[in-house]
C-alpha cells in the first residue's frame, strides 16, 4: 500500500515540476526572443549546444548509473556514502578532463572566438552539475525537495529575465540567467545531501567496478546527444545564426510537449524495473499497455494541436521574425509520433529497466550516424526544415531497431486498440482547427477558439468512446472534489 502511495505522490510532484518547466519558458521566451532577435538567440543556442558536448564528457552516463546503484543501497547510510563517494570522485575526474578538452578546442578552432565569452559563461553548468550531485536526491526519491527547489529558482530567474534583459546586447545576461535557472539549484545540494550521506572525494574509486557500465551508458547518451544536437551545430556551420535561431524556436516548442509525455517514464521506470526483476510478465505487459495508453492519450492531441496551430504558436512565442519556424515545427511534431513508440516506449520503458542499455545504445549510434550524414547532405539545401526532417528519420531508425531487438516476451498486440481512440480525437482536432481558419477571425479570437474548442472536443470524444485513461482521470478528480466537500 505504501508503495502505491509513494508512486502516486511522486507522480503528482513530477507533474508539478514538469508543468513549471513548461510554464516558465512560455512566459519568458516570447519576451526574450523579441528583445534579443533571432541572431543573438542563435548565438546563445549555438554556444550552449557546443558546451553541451563537453558537459556530456563530464557526466558520462554517471547520473543514470548513480541513481540505479545508490537506490540499491539507500537504506544503509555508510554503504550509500561509500558508493556515492566513489561515483562522485569518478565524476570529478571526468569533469577535469572535459574542461581540459574544452580549453584545447578553443585554442584550435579560431572560429569560436566570437562565442568565447558565451562559452565561458555556459561552461559553468558543467562544474555546478558535478558539484551538486543531484542524482543523490533522485536515488532517494526526494521529489518534494527537487520540485520545490526547481520552482523557486525558476521564479527568481523569471524576475531576473524581465529586469536584466532590455535590448539585443543583453544576450550575455540571458546566458547567465539560463545557467542560474538550470544549474544554480545544484549549489543548494552541497548542504542538503548531507541529510542522506557523507559525500567526499576518494582515491579508492573502484574504477573496475563502476567504469564499464558507466561507459556503456555514456556511449548511449552520447549517441542521443549527437542526433539531438547535430542539427543545431551543423545549421550553425552551414547556414548561420539566424537559421539556428529559427530552428531552435521550433525545437524548443516541441521539447515542451516532449517533456509532458516523457515525464511519465521518470516515475514509472522504478516500478517497471521491479516487475522485470521479479520476472512477472503478466504485470509487465499489463503495465506497458497502461503506460502506452497514457502516452498516446496525452501525446496525440498535443501533436495534432502543434501541427494545426504551428503558425499561431510560432507567432505567439517568437513573433513574426520567427515565422519561418512554422514548417520545422510541423515536421518535428509529426516525427514525435515515431518517438513516442521508439525512444520513449521501447527505449525508456523497456530497454533501460531491463538493463538492455546495449540495445538502446546500438539504436542511438546507428540513428546518430544516419542523422549526421543526412544533415550534411540536406541542411545546405533545406536549412531548418531539413534539420527537422533528419530528426524524424533518426527517430524512425531507433524505433525500427528497438522493435526488431525487443524481448519476445513483450507483447505489442494491443497497440492498435490503444491508439485508435486518441487517433480519432487527434484527427478531430485537425479538422476543427482547419474549420476555424475558414472564418478569418482575429489572431487572439482564433487562437482561443482553436485551443478551447480542441480541448472540449477531444475530451468529449474520449469520454464518448470510453477511453479508460480519461475516465480514470475524471474519476480521480471527482473523488478529490468529493473528499474536499466531505471535509467541509
Predicted regions and their residues:
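Interfacial segments at transmembrane-helix termini and the short loops linking adjacent helices
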Residues: 4, 106-122, 307-339
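Membrane-proximal transmembrane or re-entrant/amphipathic helices at the cytosolic face
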Residues: 434-488
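Alpha-helical transmembrane segments of polytopic membrane transporters and translocases
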Residues: 31, 42-59, 216, 231-233, ...
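Membrane-interface junctions at transmembrane-helix termini in multi-pass inner-membrane proteins
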Residues: 116, 127-148, 334-366, 377
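Signature of the first transmembrane helix
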Residues: 5-64, 99, 103-106, 157-158, ...
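Helix-loop junctions and terminal segments of transmembrane helices
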Residues: 29-30, 59-75, 250, 254-292, ...
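Hydrophobic alpha-helical transmembrane segments
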Residues: 116, 120-123, 147-195, 213, ...
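Interhelical loop/hinge segments that connect adjacent transmembrane helices in multipass membrane
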Residues: 1-3, 7, 144-147, 171-178, ...
Amino acid at each position: 500500500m505504501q508503495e502505491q502511495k509513494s508512486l502516486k505522490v511522486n507522480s503528482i510532484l513530477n507533474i508539478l515540476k514538469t508543468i513549471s518547466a513548461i510554464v516558465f519558458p512560455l512566459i519568458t521566451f516570447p519576451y526574450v526572443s523579441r528583445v534579443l532577435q533571432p541572431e543573438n538567440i542563435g548565438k546563445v543556442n549555438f554556444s550552449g549546444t557546443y558546451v553541451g558536448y563537453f558537459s556530456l564528457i563530464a557526466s558520462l552516463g554517471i547520473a543514470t548509473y548513480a541513481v540505479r546503484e545508490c537506490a540499491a543501497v539507500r537504506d544503509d547510510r555508510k554503504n550509500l556514502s561509500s558508493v556515492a563517494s566513489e561515483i562522485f570522485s569518478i565524476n570529478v575526474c571526468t569533469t577535469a578532463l572535459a574542461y581540459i578538452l574544452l580549453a584545447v578546442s578553443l585554442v584550435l578552432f579560431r572560429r569560436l572566438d566570437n562565442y568565447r565569452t558565451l562559452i565561458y559563461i555556459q561552461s559553468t553548468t558543467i562544474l555546478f552539475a558535478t558539484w551538486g550531485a543531484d542524482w543523490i536526491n533522485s536515488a532517494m526519491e526526494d521529489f518534494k525537495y527537487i520540485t520545490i527547489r526547481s520552482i523557486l529558482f525558476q521564479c527568481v530567474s523569471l524576475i531576473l529575465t524581465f529586469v536584466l534583459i532590455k535590448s539585443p546586447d543583453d544576450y550575455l545576461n540571458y546566458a547567465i540567467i539560463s545557467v542560474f535557472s538550470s544549474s544554480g539549484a545544484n549549489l543548494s545540494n552541497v548542504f542538503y545531501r548531507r541529510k542522506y550521506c557523507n559525500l567526499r572525494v576518494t582515491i579508492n574509486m573502484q574504477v573496475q567496478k563502476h567504469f564499464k557500465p558507466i561507459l556503456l551508458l555514456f556511449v548511449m547518451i552520447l549517441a542521443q546527444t549527437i542526433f539531438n544536437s547535430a542539427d543545431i551545430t551543423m545549421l550553425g556551420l552551414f547556414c548561420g545564426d539566424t537559421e539556428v535561431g529559427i530552428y531552435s524556436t521550433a525545437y524548443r516548442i516541441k521539447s515542451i510537449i516532449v517533456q509532458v509525455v516523457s515525464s511519465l517514464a521518470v516515475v514509472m521506470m522504478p516500478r517497471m524495473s521491479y516487475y522485470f526483476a521479479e520476472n512477472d510478465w503478466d504485470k509487465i505487459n499489463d503495465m506497458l499497455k497502461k503506460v502506452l495508453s497514457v502516452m498516446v492519450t496525452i501525446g496525440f492531441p498535443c501533436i495534432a494541436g502543434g501541427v494545426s496551430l504551428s503558425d499561431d504558436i510560432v507567432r505567439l512565442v517568437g513573433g513574426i521574425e520567427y515565422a519561418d519556424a512554422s514548417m520545422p515545427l510541423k515536421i518535428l511534431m509529426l516525427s514525435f509520433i515515431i518517438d513516442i513508440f521508439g525512444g520513449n516506449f521501447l527505449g525508456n520503458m523497456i530497454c533501460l529497466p531491463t538493463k538492455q542499455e546495449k540495445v538502446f545504445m546500438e539504436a542511438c549510434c546507428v540513428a546518430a550516424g544516419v542523422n549526421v550524414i543526412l544533415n550534411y547532405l540536406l541542411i545546405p539545401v533545406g536549412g531548418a526544415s531539413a534539420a527537422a526532417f533528419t530528426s524524424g528519420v533518426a527517430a524512425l531508425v531507433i524505433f525500427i531497431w528497438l522493435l526488431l531487438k525487443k524481448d519476445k516476451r513483450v507483447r505489442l498486440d494491443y497497440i492498435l486498440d490503444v491508439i485508435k481512440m486518441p487517433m480519432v480525437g487527434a484527427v478531430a482536432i485537425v479538422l476543427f482547427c482547419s474549420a476555424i481558419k475558414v472564418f478569418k477571425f482575429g489572431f487572439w479570437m482564433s487562437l482561443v477558439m482553436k485551443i478551447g474548442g480542441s480541448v472540449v472536443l477531444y475530451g468529449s470524444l474520449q469520454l464518448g468512446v470510453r477511453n479508460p485513461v480519461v475516465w480514470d482521470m475524471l474519476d480521480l478528480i471527482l473523488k478529490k472534489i468529493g473528499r474536499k466537500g466531505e471535509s467541509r
